[in-house]
């Protein structure tokens, strides 16, 4: 997917939480999802209008998430409409009994480009304990097998915190066995139920980056690893890139880092527009205002695009042009300050070195 998008005008992707209802009770859930539908959810027609605005804005990708998007009977209708608007479409089904081969076939026929399943433990016991529903791991494995059988591109999502950061090698081996095209590694942001968990320390994050980098360079990865709320991985790669190749920009600068409100936008189940699901600052509602206007003009979104507002180490770091100042969501969740330094980064800028 091309990233020659002006992030001042449009995000690379928009995630719409089409429902907050889910039968799982995951320990980290940013939405604190419950197993009941909210009558205030956006209707199908309201969803169509949102999709129209996403396409008009120039955003190439929309993700339907939850909760469990399979709880929406109109999921296939939304997928078809988004495809008709020229968008790439992904969805993240929860691994509950609603996930069946027949439903995956239905999603595929509707035109979905990719599905993602969460894999948060290297064993059944680890995963099911984290998801707090027995059988979730088995359904994730079955869902991955169905996706492979159907030729449906598959992504695995894994949240890392202090409880499982030491299990990277085992998780990487498991994910590699599933035939995924993407592995999205999330660094915990303490929001929702996740506020009760302990994220990785800055030192643990640095060790995790080292493992991801080594895994990628060794060719052990036949898929792309994306890191969410860990933009400073780009700083790590820059530090370990070695001599530059003439005529070629390193991978970490050839694409733009995506940040909350700056390349990324989130709409919750009732239509509130936020910079990210992990940065749930409500900046308007799609029932009343266009997501285009909010993304381009709302003061919070404009500030998030202004690197000069960054404070602390992020404000003076020489790698700021590379990583963009780390995770604004984590800084806000931990400190209450939107532009504080990212507490998950251990790097000491050269200008602060004694």
Regions found by a protein language model. Name each.
Residues 53-56, 109, 177-180, 311, ...:
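Alpha-helix termination/capping residues and helix-transition junctions
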């Amino acid at each position: 997917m091309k990233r020659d998008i002006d992030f001042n005008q449009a995000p690379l992707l928009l995630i719409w939480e089409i429902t907050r209802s889910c039968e799982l009770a995951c320990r980290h859930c940013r939405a604190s999802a419950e197993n009941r539908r909210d009558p205030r959810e956006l209707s199908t027609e309201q969803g169509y209008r949102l999709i129209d605005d996403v396409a008009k804005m120039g955003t190439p990708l929309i993700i339907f998430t939850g909760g469990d998007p399979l709880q929406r009977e109109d999921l296939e209708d939304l997928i078809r409409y988004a495809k008709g608007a020229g968008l790439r479409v992904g969805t993240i089904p929860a691994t509950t009994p609603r996930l069946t081969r027949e439903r995956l076939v239905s999603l595929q026929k509707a035109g979905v480009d990719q599905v993602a399943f969460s894999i948060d433990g290297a064993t059944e016991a680890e995963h099911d304990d984290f998801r707090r529903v027995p059988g979730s791991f088995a359904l994730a494995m079955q869902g991955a097998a169905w996706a492979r059988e159907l030729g449906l591109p598959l992504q695995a999502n894994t949240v890392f915190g202090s409880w499982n950061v030491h299990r990277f090698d085992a998780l990487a081996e498991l994910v590699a066995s599933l035939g995924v095209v993407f592995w999205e590694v999330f660094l915990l942001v303490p929001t929702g139920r996740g506020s009760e968990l302990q994220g990785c320390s800055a030192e643990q994050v640095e060790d995790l980056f080292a493992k991801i980098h080594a895994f990628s360079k060794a060719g052990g990865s036949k898929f792309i690893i994306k890191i969410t709320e860990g933009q400073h991985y780009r700083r790590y790669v820059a530090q370990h890139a070695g001599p530059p190749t003439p005529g070629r920009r390193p991978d970490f600068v050839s694409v733009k880092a995506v940040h909350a409100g700056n390349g990324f936008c989130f709409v919750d189940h009732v239509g509130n527009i936020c910079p990210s699901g992990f940065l749930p600052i409500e900046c308007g509602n799609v029932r009343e205002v266009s997501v285009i206007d909010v993304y381009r003009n709302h003061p919070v979104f404009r500030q998030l695009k202004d690197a000069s507002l960054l404070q602390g180490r992020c404000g003076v770091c020489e790698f700021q042009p590379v990583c963009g100042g780390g995770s604004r969501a984590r800084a806000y969740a931990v400190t209450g300050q939107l532009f504080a330094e990212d507490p998950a980064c251990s790097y000491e800028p050269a200008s602060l070195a004694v």
